[in-house]
Amino acid sequence: MNNEETEVKPWIVRIILIVGGLFGAHRLYLKQVPEAFVFFSTLGVLLIGWLYDSFMFKYEVNEYNQLINQSENNKEKEKWKNGKMQASQSKFVDFSFTRFLYSVLYGSYIGLATWLACTVTFGWTDINLIPFICVVALGITAGIYIIGQCGGQSRELSYIWMASFSSMFIMVRLAQTTVFRAIFLTAIVSTVIGNRSARLKKRRHTWKHFLFWSSLFLMLVCVILLGCSRKVADKQVTATRPGTFRETISVGSLIRDRIFDAKKVHSFFEGNPIIEYHSKSDIKNKNGEKTLKNSSFWYQVWSGELFDELTGAAHLTKIDWIELTTTFIVDVLRSEARVIDGSSTIEPFKWALWRNYLIHRFSLDPLISDDRLRTECKKWQTEEKSKKGNVDRDYNILAAKQGCSTFLL
């Protein structure tokens, strides 16, 4: 071999683990590229994997050094009979429940991230659409394929893709399951089918594979962040004070001011004003439309006009869980202002959480006003008082009672 590999020092791996362990730098140094990407895309598997490797990294180093010291003939364990290799035995891989669990969870993770990007950024809410099913199935396939490459093994990409698409199609179009259940069950089926093609890996991945996978993942994250900025941060909040004036600000500006200048947020919600929500206007005049039509493709790309055109559907599409997230953020901020004013003594997070629960409990619009929600609570309380029966063990009723009493304080 022209490029002979040398043994690695444990202290070097420890330093790399401390500095860049959350992003999989130590795994990349040990040429465990798929494992490094999993660390990178999950921040060290939410710190748990990073903590585990901080204690067990010596075993990984010893295993790597043993592979380096092995002769060329012993790099792959092959079964021979009468001078011929038995291919079926050389490809045999033992079943591992741990790997199976990792594959299902990571495939579901990437699949959910793909679904989130399509929903938040591009406004795809109908999961029954074939293109939507294809994109989500592709995300699940990518996650299962990456896990299948870990530990010196590999999986056939075509097997995983066919199983993922067909399972997703059946779950969504025929079984009519929810998105989360469909993604999870599809990940299970795809992992089982993919394991049928499991074999020992015969080539090593390089940093180019890591760079390519990381670029795709970062692009996915950027798409999600851009969508969240349009659906959440760009949402306009109007505070109306009777007999005074109306003031409008975006949710993103409120979050920024809460971090850097909390007094602005408190002054905005001072006096418990009437809160209204509305989307940022995207209406353009005719001259703007003509400019968009006459401008070149690259000008539209660099100016952001093309992105606005592609994500226009998401900007107009109403998604309940995103609206609930927006109202929860605003509720926490205005509840903090009420505590500072002395008009409330309830913990802001608790008050906002109960308010969101009541919206979900009564199936109301996420952007409902406080007056309307108070009316619904009083109406529900009146109806419950007129009913006879033992409700001490009905947790739905008990939760609604607690939520209404907390909100009406």
Curated annotation (Swiss-Prot):
Domain TM2: 8-55
Alphabetized UniProt keyword annotations: Membrane, Transmembrane, Transmembrane helix
Keyword Ligase: no
Assigned GO CC terms: membrane
InterPro entries: TM2
Domain of life the protein comes from: Eukaryota
Lipid bilayer topology: Multi-pass membrane protein
Subcellular localization, as worded in the UniProt entry: Membrane
Residue spans crossing the bilayer: 10-30, 37-57, 104-124, 127-147, 168-190, 209-229
Family: Belongs to the TM2 family.
This protein's name: TM2 domain-containing protein ZK858.5
Annotated organism of origin: Caenorhabditis elegans
Organism phylogeny: Eukaryota, Metazoa, Ecdysozoa, Nematoda, Chromadorea
